[in-house]
């Protein structure tokens, strides 16, 4: 799988912080509302350097804990301006489980309820009997970014664990994409059908930046002109680093099948929402992740996708946030469950990597 910097402009900044003692920060979710750059950091009492789990001195046996912090960043330097510890002040009962806290929060905004989050949770007690399962929870925040309301998304579909739903950002009301290649849309109450199966853009939001044809053409030309050089450089790097890097064959055929939600979906055209999903395999008994950029339309149908790429050269990688400001695309991702990073690129360059999805009609 190729590195991101072989395919697109790719500048990476380490934004790792430790808002809580003896806890690592990971899986950051960046969000931009046109004025403020916010980012939720997931902070945990364990980490996975090199795919091997280590635990902090504060970790309790048989238990892992997640706390969250909201960071306001200066987008020029990516230095923190303000840090808020997000306290859990919702009134839902907790269960005695091994995983505590709201995990991998994705930030999004709607006209109806403002800034919200969607997270995975195992620690909320279910009212009915049965096994505790990971489920998605919609979070409401106050002005200090405390979690003041948590609404589990439950129903007939939740007999199996549910994680990594992709929220549509800056839309009229909450919409979530699950099963990217199938285009399954949900709201906060459950699966959508009929006329409700659509994402309506915010009536208050900014107009999306759409690169003109000249910008798109230049990006495509740069990608095509440098392909051979990139291949040569990639082979040289792969040969020289063979003892330190896993060699994974790039997925063939329908490379986009089985993608799982990573970042929010951000509007990138009149009927186009851009996101990044991930896939994973095992290499030498260790997890190996890669990412794919993709576009869906307002009904959640997959229209195009990039070929797989690695956001980080090595380690577990997990993208949870994305924001677009003009032609600037900012991606936030975690590495080895112990680092938080920002990757910056160009919208025109990203769109130039996308390939149309042609589906057969039965």
Predicted region positions:
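Beta-propeller domains
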Residues: 1-362
């Amino acid at each position: 799988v190729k590195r991101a910097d072989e395919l697109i402009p790719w500048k990476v900044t380490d934004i790792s912080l430790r808002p809580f003692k003896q806890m690592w920060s990971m899986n950051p979710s960046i969000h931009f509302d046109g004025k403020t750059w916010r980012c939720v950091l997931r902070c945990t009492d364990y980490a996975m350097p090199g795919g091997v789990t280590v635990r902090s001195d504060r970790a309790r046996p048989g238990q892992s804990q997640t706390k969250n912090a909201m960071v306001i960043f200066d987008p020029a330097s990516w230095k923190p301006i303000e840090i808020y510890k997000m306290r859990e002040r919702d009134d839902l009962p907790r269960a005695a489980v091994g995983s505590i806290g709201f995990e991998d929060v994705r930030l999004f905004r709607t006209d109806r309820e403002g800034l919200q989050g969607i997270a995975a949770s195992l620690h909320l007690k279910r009212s009915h009997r049965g096994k505790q399962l990971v489920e998605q929870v919609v979070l409401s925040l106050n002005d200090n970014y405390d979690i003041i309301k948590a609404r589990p998304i439950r129903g007939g579909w939740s007999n199996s664990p549910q994680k990594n739903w992709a929220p549509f950002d800056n839309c009229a009301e909450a919409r979530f994409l699950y099963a990217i290649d199938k285009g399954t849309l949900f709201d906060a109450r459950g699966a959508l059908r009929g006329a409700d199966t659509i994402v309506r853009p915010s009536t208050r939001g900014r107009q999306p930046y759409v690169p003109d044809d000249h910008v798109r053409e230049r990006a495509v030309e740069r990608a095509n002109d440098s392909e051979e050089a990139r291949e040569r450089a990639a082979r040289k790097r792969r040969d020289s680093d063979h003892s330190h890097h896993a060699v994974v064959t790039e997925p063939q055929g329908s490379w986009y099948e089985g993608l799982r939600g990573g970042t929010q979906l951000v509007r990138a055209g009149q009927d186009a929402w851009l996101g990044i999903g991930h896939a994973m395999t095992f290499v030498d008994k260790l997890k190996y992740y890669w990412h794919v950029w993709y576009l869906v339309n307002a009904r959640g149908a997959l229209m195009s996708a990039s070929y797989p790429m690695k956001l980080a050269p090595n380690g577990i990688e997990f993208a949870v946030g994305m924001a677009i400001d003009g032609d600037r695309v900012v991606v936030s991702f975690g590495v080895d469950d112990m680092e938080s990073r920002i990757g910056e690129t160009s919208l025109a360059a990203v769109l130039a990597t996308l390939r149309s999805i042609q589906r057969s009609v039965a």
